[in-house]
């Protein structure tokens, strides 16, 4: 029997304060298993992939079909993940109240819902966007359910490093929707999300390592401990910051404005990584980094969209013109 008393973590923080409890934020069972809290960030990176393409901005109907199809595919992946892990969820306090382990929804009904969402996503993307976008969405779904959930997660502490490919596919979907192909800029954002994912997820895993240890999931904090995990977070955090700067060249226009606006985002990310590195056991710092990393990726995608506005292109032209004038007049010497 699972205790109803919130379990305290180091620093006097409960799991319910880290990940909102389903007892406090009650969703309908059919919506809960779709993991709707994860979908907005996936759609944001899809928009980022679109903004990097020459086909931006998209016609309204194609934009709606892309985001709608992506949301349905993400929902299907979330449901299939819940079906696969229902026994595991039932053994962890944090997840024991979810729809499937608690019996509020049957696995059969959930599976029918997942198949329905998958078919609807494929139909919407094929008819309203293109086959490449549809195929990439289905690849992301399969990567999450099969590669990450079924194969990597229960077997290796590097599960999220490789399995992060699933969460990095939406930018490719966006690029395919905008231009019919995936160029280097789309692959840049794919790579950025891949590098961002381990630091983001390991910050959460530090908070929940007791849960993972109890059910035998070999997350990095469970196998290597907080100190090694925080060092890995630092490496991936720095790699994320370095790669994010290449967006200046990945953008068709507006890259200079993107680069300037990126500076405070990267500075804050590195500050929080450094603070966690100084106190690997500090729950508040791990929680802060986890939350900021979400805001960071939303911010990157917003910067990509803003950088495609006409005013961003004008800013770039004026800035480069000013720099050329200063160079020709010898003011840099």
From Swiss-Prot:
Transmembrane segments: 63-83, 109-129, 132-152, 160-180, 188-208, 214-234, 245-265, 292-312
The entry's keywords: Cell inner membrane, Cell membrane, Heme biosynthesis, Membrane, Transferase, Transmembrane, Transmembrane helix
Subcellular locations according to the entry: Cell inner membrane
Principal EC category: transferase
Catalytic reactions on record: heme b + (2E,6E)-farnesyl diphosphate + H2O = Fe(II)-heme o + diphosphate
Highest taxon, organism lineage: Bacteria
GO molecular function: protoheme IX farnesyltransferase activity
Pfam families hit by this protein: UbiA
Disulfide bonds: none
The EC number(s) this enzyme carries: 2.5.1.141
Other remarks on this protein: Carbon 2 of the heme B porphyrin ring is defined according to the Fischer nomenclature.
Family named by the database record: Belongs to the UbiA prenyltransferase family. Protoheme IX farnesyltransferase subfamily.
Function: Converts heme B (protoheme IX) to heme O by substitution of the vinyl group on carbon 2 of heme B porphyrin ring with a hydroxyethyl farnesyl side group.
Official protein name in the record: Protoheme IX farnesyltransferase
The organism of origin for this protein: Prochlorococcus marinus (strain MIT 9313)
Biological classification of the source: Bacteria, Bacillati, Cyanobacteriota, Cyanophyceae, Synechococcales
